[in-house]
């Protein structure tokens, strides 16, 4: 169960991470504290997912660096445009046998609330439930700053579906190695 939760979290972050490779050096850091991020897949029979993230400047940069750098290596196009308070990111990235072309529009403030609208098109790779091959998918994210992190949270903690994990631990094995 924990491994599936990690996989789902990583999938969501990498899907959103399509904006990170192009924007990692350009996006301002989010305000330190507790953020709630609601992810909604549009036009697919997938329930909305809400996650909370306790961040500070270091863990926000770590997230951008980990997911942004990994994805950047796989992207042939990364274009970012800033117009006032709107950031637009276009990218073409290859992951295994799949090529993902994405367009993201980011609005709002990284101090209080922001919205990310992502549309993407996949070519190749395994089929996704509810998505025709080559079909477009849409996802929206709404990030809201809730205040200070709870006393039992440390920067990098993410809570999704009632389970807590830390961004620093995502690459670590779930089960300790056998002696």
Task: Provide a role label for each language-model segment.
Residues 1-13:
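Bacterial N-terminal signal peptides that target proteins for export
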Residues 131-176:
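Edge beta-strand at a domain terminus
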Residues 37-74, 162-172:
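Short, solvent-exposed loop/hinge segments that bridge or flank secondary-structure elements
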Residues 14-24:
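Hydrophobic h-region of N-terminal signal peptides that target proteins for export
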Residues 37-40, 88-95, 116-123, 130:
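Short beta-strand segments that buttress and anchor functional surface loops
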Residues 48-49, 98-103, 136-140:
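Short, surface-exposed coil-to-beta transition loops
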